[in-house]
A protein has these predicted regions:
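C-terminal motif of bacterial Sec signal peptides marking the signal peptidase cleavage site
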Residues: 19-24
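Hydrophobic alpha-helical
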Residues: 98, 102, 107-126, 191, ...
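Flexible loop/hinge segments that line or gate small-molecule binding clefts
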Residues: 115-153, 171, 262-270, 274-275
Length: 363
């Protein structure tokens, strides 16, 4: 866990917490590979809302929000950012979005609890002239923009590697994220596609981790205690704690797939670590969402309403993968934080600014 005084403590985002950060002034971001350029409009000032319904205590979600705060500071034309971050469901997020609408923000960034359930509130926001951007996963509401990792490909890459590492036979523990979350749904599509291509693979157990490390640890312990035989583990980003649980239980390591989280990458590079692969899933998509919002607000709309970041797979079973893992490794980060701290063309803050996790006006 992240200790008091660390990034998590500085983020100050507890259940039902609402964080308001005030004005900042610095240079506007360049966005050479992002659609439409920097997004800065001369003299224009904007307010941004961010709704994140879940993942309180999850390192990826913490990094996403820190990224948004850091990019808002760098933009120089954001007067306030309001973040509503709590563990809730789609109806709860509908309420949160409407709270942001009532505050009169210019743009709302959401990590959506569902692809369709938020459409009524999104439609209300768009009718009020508010730009709406979904990050991490997509929504279907007309007029909204989607900016995320390609989650289907994320799962397909990892599952395909895993099944080959298992010798195209055996049983896998399938550890999913949050039921109904569009990213989880897309990942399941990718996982099932890979599964069909490897008929020798069966599923030993399926769990829904809610992307919570403690929940995932209990689930793998339950699988082990039940005597369920398995030959591989696919995790939806809760990974280092699963390796720790195998070790604590005295269970032999099996091939495992996770995300590019700091702790997991360190484990993959260890001489006595498991055979495994990390698939990239940058939480800096939060900061990229700020950049896209500012571009749209300044009249620089992208050609498409959905933009995907392409994931990569880094395995410790080949030289190229080991080189990627070694280059990305960063033991200074909390183990649950992803290593994709920035996205070229979309974010302009430094690592130190991200880790400080301070938005405009924060002391």
């Amino acid at each position: 866990m992240i200790q008091k005084g660390s990034i998590k403590a500085r983020l100050m985002i507890g259940i039902a917490a609402v964080i308001v950060v005030a004005a900042a002034c610095s240079s506007a971001p360049g966005a050479s590979t992002a659609p439409g350029g920097s997004g800065a409009a001369s003299g224009a000032k904007y307010t941004i809302g961010f709704s994140n319904p879940g993942g309180v205590g999850n390192g990826w979600r913490e990094a996403m929000l820190c990224s948004a705060k850091a990019q808002a500071v760098k933009a120089g034309n954001v007067t306030k950012v309001t973040i509503i971050h709590r563990d809730t469901d789609a109806p709860g997020q509908l309420s949160d979005i409407r709270t942001l609408i009532a505050q009169g923000v210019n743009a709302i960034i959401i990590n959506p609890a569902g692809p369709d359930a938020l459409n009524p509130a999104i439609a209300e926001a768009i009718a009020a002239g508010i730009t709406v951007i979904a990050v991490d996963a997509s929504v279907t509401a007309p007029g909204a923009y989607n900016l995320s990792n390609d989650q289907e490909q994320y799962a397909y890459l990892g599952a395909s590697w895993l099944f080959k590492a298992m010798g195209d036979k055996g049983a896998v523990v399938y550890m999913r994220g949050i039921a109904g979350h569009p990213a989880d749904t897309d990942r399941d599509t990718g996982f099932q596609r890979a599964l069909k291509e490897h008929p020798g693979i069966t599923i030993a157990a399926t769990t829904v981790t809610k992307w919570d490390p403690a929940t995932a640890t209990q689930q793998i312990n339950d699988v082990i205690s039940a005597g369920t035989k398995f030959d591989g583990i696919w995790t939806s980003g809760v990974d280092s704690n699963i390796v720790d649980a195998l070790k604590a239980a005295g269970h032999p390591y099996v091939p495992i797939v996770g995300a590019d989280n700091a702790g997991f990458v360190t484990q993959l590079l260890a001489a006595d670590g498991p055979k495994g692969a990390a698939v990239t899933n940058p939480a800096s998509i939060g900061g990229a969402g700020v950049t896209l919002a500012l571009q749209i607000l300044s009249g620089q709309k992208p050609a498409a309403t959905t933009v995907h970041v392409t994931p990569e797979l880094w395995s410790n079973t080949d030289d190229a993968g080991k080189a990627k893992l070694t280059a990305a490794a960063d033991p200074s980060l909390p183990k649950t934080w992803p290593l994709g701290l920035t996205i070229d063309g979309w974010t302009t803050y430094t690592k130190a600014e991200l880790i400080a996790c301070k938005g405009p006006g924060d002391a």
